């Protein structure tokens, strides 16, 4: 039985108020107890005690949406004007510069290293190369959810899919988007998840073009992208918004869904999100990079299932969750007010866990949860410890662990 005691000046449980000059007792990779250091030392004799000192101990970041497998593609991305232009670049790169399996694996491994060095302990990764990228993810020591990306070409095989799951690794389905998956494909994914009690993810409401597509209006997906892919148009129910489209087709019924981006969502749709218990994952820097707008963060402040993701380096500058958090904070501070720092840190931890439906395992410092923790030693301390986290950078990460096992520690 492995036992550890971590002491810190500040502990941010996320699920409760900050705790000062206390400790977290770990047993077999789980959080067992939080309390005063002296009391825990007396209670647990001969425990390995690591006094971290001045700094903040908090749950590891949950990067709730990435495309590590596309790391190789950055050398083909130059200037572009619109989201559609960017999609054309991605299609061209995949067609004319198809990556080798080694390139894909190297992209994933490089991404994993970047994630670990910037405080991520759980990653939700999209797998779009028929599983080539899964092996490095199984062995990376991060807590990993791999979403197998589904397009119409996979439709006939959905029933046969077998999803793997172990302590640190889990597979789920990810129909790409309403404009790239026909209603028939989405229906098959929904039925599969309903039958097998699985959740799925989807890119949803990312761009205005998607809203035009859903409304059966002229759009650049059908006009410009389908011809490049040799894809035929498909009939669909008309809806005013992507969220309404999913509701009309009953694709949320009885299943848990993690919806990524959710930029073009209307105020009245907040109630729909709550009623259907949808997990919302925001990628604000990616949205800015791709010029699709910014999510209605003030609306989402009311949600518990609200997470943050960096997306991939194909649509962002890096995979750094510290930078994602600070961008999120600075972008919406004026709109949301003084609670923005706490909201940003929540979305990067417990909110992300809830958006991925893994809050029973990770996301906060509570007894029974996995010891997926990070410790930062900020240069600048604010009165508000959440603001201190927001102001921190990856260079101030002093410790990262998953299941109580150290992943990163520059001092060791």
Walk through the language-model features, giving the residues of each.
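Active-site beta-loop-alpha junctions enriched in small/polar residues
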Residues: 67, 128-129, 147-153, 176-178, ...
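Alpha-helical scaffold segments that flank or form the walls of functional sites
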Residues: 56-57, 74-140, 161-166
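C-terminal cap of metal-dependent C-N hydrolases
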Residues: 370-412
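His/Asp/Glu-enriched, well-ordered alpha-helical/loop segment
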Residues: 248-252, 282, 295-379, 392
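Histidine/acidic residue-rich metal-binding segments in metalloenzymes
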Residues: 132-139, 158-279, 291-306, 360
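N-terminal metal-binding scaffold of metallo-dependent hydrolase/deaminase domains
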Residues: 1-43, 358, 405
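Active-site gating loops and adjacent loop-to-helix segments of metal-dependent hydrolytic enzymes
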Residues: 72-105, 145, 208-254, 328-336
């Amino acid at each position: 039985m492995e036992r550890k005691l971590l002491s810190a000046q500040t502990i941010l449980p996320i699920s409760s108020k900050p705790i000062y000059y206390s400790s977290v007792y770990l047993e077999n990779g789980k959080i067992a107890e939080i309390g005063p250091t002296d009391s825990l030392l007396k209670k647990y004799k001969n425990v390995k005690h690591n006094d971290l000192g001045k700094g903040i101990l908090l749950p590891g970041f949950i990067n709730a949406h990435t495309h590590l497998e596309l790391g190789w593609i950055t050398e083909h991305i130059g200037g572009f004007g619109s989201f559609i232009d960017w999609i054309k670049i991605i299609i061209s790169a995949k067609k004319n510069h198809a990556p080798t399996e080694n390139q894909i694996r190297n992209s994933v491994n490089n991404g994993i290293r970047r994630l670990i060095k910037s405080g991520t302990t759980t990653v939700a990764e999209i797998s779009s190369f028929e599983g080539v990228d899964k092996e490095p993810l199984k062995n990376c020591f991060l807590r990993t959810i791999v979403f197998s990306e589904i397009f119409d070409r996979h439709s006939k095989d959905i029933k046969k899919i077998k999803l793997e799951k172990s302590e640190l690794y889990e597979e789920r389905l990810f129909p790409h988007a309403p404009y790239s998956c026909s209603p028939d494909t989405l229906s098959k994914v929904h039925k599969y998840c309903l039958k097998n009690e699985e959740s799925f993810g989807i890119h949803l409401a990312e761009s205005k073009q998607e809203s035009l597509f859903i409304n059966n209006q002229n759009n650049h997906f059908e006009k410009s992208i389908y011809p490049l892919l040799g894809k035929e148009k498909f009939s669909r129910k008309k809806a005013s918004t992507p969220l309404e489209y999913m509701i009309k087709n009953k694709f949320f019924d009885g299943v848990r869904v993690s919806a990524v981006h959710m930029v073009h969502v209307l105020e009245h749709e907040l109630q729909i999100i709550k009623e259907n218990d949808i997990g919302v994952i925001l990628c604000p820097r990616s949205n800015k990079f791709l010029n699709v707008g910014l999510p209605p963060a003030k609306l989402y402040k009311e949600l518990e299932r609200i997470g943050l993701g960096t997306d991939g380096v194909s649509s962002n500058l890096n995979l750094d969750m510290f930078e994602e958090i600070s961008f999120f904070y600075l972008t919406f501070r004026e709109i949301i007010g003084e609670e923005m720092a706490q909201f940003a840190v929540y979305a990067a931890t417990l909110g992300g866990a809830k958006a991925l439906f893994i809050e029973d395992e990770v996301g906060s410092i509570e007894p029974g949860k996995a010891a997926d923790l990070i410790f930062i030693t900020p240069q600048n301390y604010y009165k508000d410890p959440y603001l201190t986290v927001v102001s921190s950078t990856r260079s101030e990460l002093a410790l990262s662990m998953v299941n109580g096992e150290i992943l990163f520690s520059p001092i060791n």
